[in-house]
Design a protein with these regions (language model features):
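C-terminal "cap" of GNAT-fold acetyltransferases
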Residues: 77-79, 84-122
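Conserved glycine-rich acetyl-CoA-binding loop
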Residues: 25, 38-39, 51-65, 73-74, ...
């Protein structure tokens, strides 16, 4: 459930969530989270969303870059993510950022619908 995400991010050390907006209109968001079961040096890129109007503007790349920078500041050396093959453009962007495919999931994210797993050293 997303009902209490603000409280979850606010109360979890080494987590962060960022939103992108223009003229008061929400365009997207992305965050990092030390997902349960991941190694201590690894966080997850989570809740990466863009509105349809924001796609193709480079905003996703900016948000990923910012998340990777903050992850490094927080002391993480790897960033993990889970996605789906249907999100071809997103997967392509992750590959361009240097994320590599994994054969199985890491941690206990609870994302049963995601069947692609990727990781990047930072």
């Amino acid at each position: 459930s997303t009902d209490h995400l603000f409280e979850l991010f606010e109360s979890t050390p080494r987590s962060a969530y960022f939103i992108a907006e223009k003229n008061g209109i929400l365009l997207g968001g992305a965050g990092i989270f030390p997902t349960e079961g991941l190694p201590d040096d690894t966080c997850e890129l989570v809740k990466m969303y863009l509105t349809s109007k924001a796609r193709g503007m480079g905003l996703g790349r900016k948000m990923i870059t910012h998340c990777l920078e903050v992850a490094a500041i927080e002391g993480f050396s790897q960033v993990y993510l889970e996605t789906m093959p249907e999100l071809k453009k997103a997967v392509s962007v992750y590959e361009k950022f240097g994320f590599a495919f994994l054969p199985a999931p890491m941690g206990n994210s609870g994302h049963c619908g995601c069947d692609m797993w990727m990781i990047k050293k930072i």
